[in-house]
C-alpha cells in the first residue's frame, strides 16, 4: 500500500507577521459635559453637575472634590461642545493674600492665583479677601484623552500645594 504524504502546513517564508498596532489616539478639539464627567468617573473624582440659573447664563458648571480639595470646572464657549474649560479653586489665606499670590505666581507657572473680595454676611458690611487659583485648559489645537487626564492629575497636585501654601503649612525649602 503506497504511503500518502501529508503536506505540513507551514507559513511561507515571505509572509511577515505584523505586530498588533494600537489605534491612533483620538484628537479632541472640544468636550461635552458627558465626556468630562466620564473622565472624572475614571479618575474617581467626586462631582456634581450644576446649572447656572441666572437669566443671561444657562451654562453648566461642575463642582468637584479631589484629594479632599474642592474645585470647580467651568466649561467655556458655545455648548454643548466646549472648546475650553476653566479649573478654579478658592482658598482663604492665613497671611497677606496679595503677597502670597505674588509668591505663588512666581513659583507655579501652571496656573494663576489672584485675590478677590467676598461679603461674609447678609448685610454686606463684612468683607473677606480670598484667593482664587485658576487654570485655563484649551482644546482648540487638539488634545488626546490622555492629555486631559494628565491635566487633571497635575491639577490635583496644584490643589494640594496651593492649599498648603496659602494656609502656611507648605515647607518651600523641601
Regions found by a protein language model. Give the residues of each.
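Long, contiguous binding/interaction regions
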Residues: 157
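Short, internal acidic amphipathic alpha-helical interface segments
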Residues: 83-130
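Charged/polar positions within long, soluble alpha-helices
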Residues: 113, 160, 164-167
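Charge-rich, low-complexity N-terminal segments
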Residues: 1-74, 115
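Long, continuous compositionally biased terminal/linker segments
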Residues: 64-96
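Hydrophobic residues embedded in beta-strands of well-ordered beta-sheets
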Residues: 60-62, 80, 129-131
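A short, terminal or domain-edge coil/loop segment
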Residues: 32-42, 99-118, 169-174
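Well-ordered alpha/beta subsegment
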Residues: 119-153, 164-174
